[in-house]
């Protein structure tokens, strides 16, 4: 008998000669007694019986009978076993925390399945209304659902895949892990099959999804604060000659030539620090995005927000104009990091995990990817 502390499991290994001498009911009795006398919490543990391939090929009937009565047993090997209308692929099993693989049932059929005995669920589905209903039935929070749907749709768009492309969702069943305490379940990860290299997103404590390398699946910032492309009339330049003052002075942002009245968007979530008029900047807006970043938008025709307002990425905050010290209709856009101005082109639009968090994330990601591979 071997204990694996990482996954909170017990491994029992029997010789084939021993197995052949007893009936499957005897095995169930042995395991039941063992569990009752064990200090390990039943609902957070699992038993793994290890058989070699020759035994399994010759004794499929026994194994099927053994699996059905004990729902938290998974076997190691290369052949498949039918498991209560679910298909478990058992090859290369090295301690998966996943019990069953659930395919994309219609909503009504899913309601008829008892999922309370599952710790983890893999759900294969398209991202559509049926998917959202199923996630809600599985007691996943709307915020979690919205988050994963947004990330997946973005990845599909980036990789030029159809929006009805199928993906795999890994759900943690908290009602099982917490002994039926009412708590929302969590989508831990998603996998999008894509050629020879699949696309992954992994849920973190930050309530965001990150890829295998620790980079956020969804951007936290827009590249620029508008939807269409506009000509750069003046680049970021610490030593620029100022056409207004006729002196060398830093140009701390980028100027985009655009028609007056062009909608200007917040590049990310944040709070409005300033929304007023000044002689030089004209109508301008300053947004604090987090503890690190501040963005500024100048020479606006109209301001659509006020100090203290909370804004989301892509919220319309103003209209471009030609106010203040300006030689023509344009938007002056600045980005500040830790109170120092940076070139807006160098803004990292996706969040990156660092140091300890990154190491833990990569380890977690590798484990989950292995489990996705098992159920293909």
From Swiss-Prot:
The keyword Repressor does not apply. InterPro entries: Cell_wall_metabolism_enzyme, Csd3_N2, Dup_hybrid_motif, Peptidase_M23. It is found in: Cell membrane. This is Uncharacterized metalloprotease bbp_296. Belongs to the peptidase M23B family. The chain crosses the membrane at residues 24-44. Coiled coil: none annotated. Zn(2+) binds at residue 251. GO terms for cellular component: plasma membrane. GO terms for biological process: proteolysis. GO terms for molecular function: metal ion binding; metalloendopeptidase activity. It comes from Buchnera aphidicola subsp. Baizongia pistaciae (strain Bp). Its cofactor is Zn(2+). Its main location: membrane. CDD domains: M23_peptidase (cd12797).
């Amino acid at each position: 008998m071997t204990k694996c502390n990482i996954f909170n499991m017990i491994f029992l290994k029997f010789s084939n000669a021993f197995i052949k001498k007893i009936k499957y009911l005897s095995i169930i009795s042995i395991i039941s007694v063992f569990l009752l006398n064990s200090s390990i919490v039943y609902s957070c543990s699992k038993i793994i019986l290890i058989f070699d391939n020759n035994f399994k090929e010759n004794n499929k009937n026994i194994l099927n009978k053994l699996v059905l009565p004990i729902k938290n047993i998974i076997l190691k090997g290369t052949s498949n076993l039918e498991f209560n209308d679910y298909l478990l692929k058992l090859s290369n099993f090295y301690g998966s925390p996943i019990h069953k693989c659930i395919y994309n049932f219609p909503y009504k059929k899913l309601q008829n399945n008892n999922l309370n005995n599952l710790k983890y669920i893999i759900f294969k589905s398209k991202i559509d209304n049926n998917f959202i209903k199923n996630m809600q039935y599985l007691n996943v929070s709307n915020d979690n659902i919205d988050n994963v749907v947004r990330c997946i749709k973005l990845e599909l768009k980036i990789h030029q895949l159809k929006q009805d492309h199928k993906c795999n969702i890994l759900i943690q069943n908290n009602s099982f892990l917490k002994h039926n305490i009412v708590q929302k379940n969590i989508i831990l990860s998603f996998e999008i099959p894509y050629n020879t290299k699949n696309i992954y997103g992994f849920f973190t404590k930050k309530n965001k999804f990150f890829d295998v390398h620790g980079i956020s699946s969804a951007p936290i910032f827009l590249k620029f604060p508008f939807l269409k492309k506009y000509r750069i009339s003046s680049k970021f330049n610490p030593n620029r000659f100022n056409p207004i003052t006729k002196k060398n002075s830093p140009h701390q942002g980028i100027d985009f030539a655009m028609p007056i009245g062009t909608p200007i968007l917040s590049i990310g979530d944040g709070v409005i620090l300033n929304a007023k008029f000044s002689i030089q900047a004209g109508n301008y807006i300053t947004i604090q995005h987090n503890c690190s970043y501040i963005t500024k938008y100048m020479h606006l025709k109209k301001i659509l927000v006020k100090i203290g307002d909370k804004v989301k990425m892509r919220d319309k905050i103003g209209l471009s104009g030609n106010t203040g010290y300006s030689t023509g209709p344009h938007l002056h856009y600045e980005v500040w990091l830790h109170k120092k101005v940076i070139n807006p082109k160098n803004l990292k639009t996706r969040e990156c995990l660092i140091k300890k968090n990154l190491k833990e994330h990569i380890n977690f990601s590798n484990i989950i990817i292995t489990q996705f591979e098992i159920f293909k």
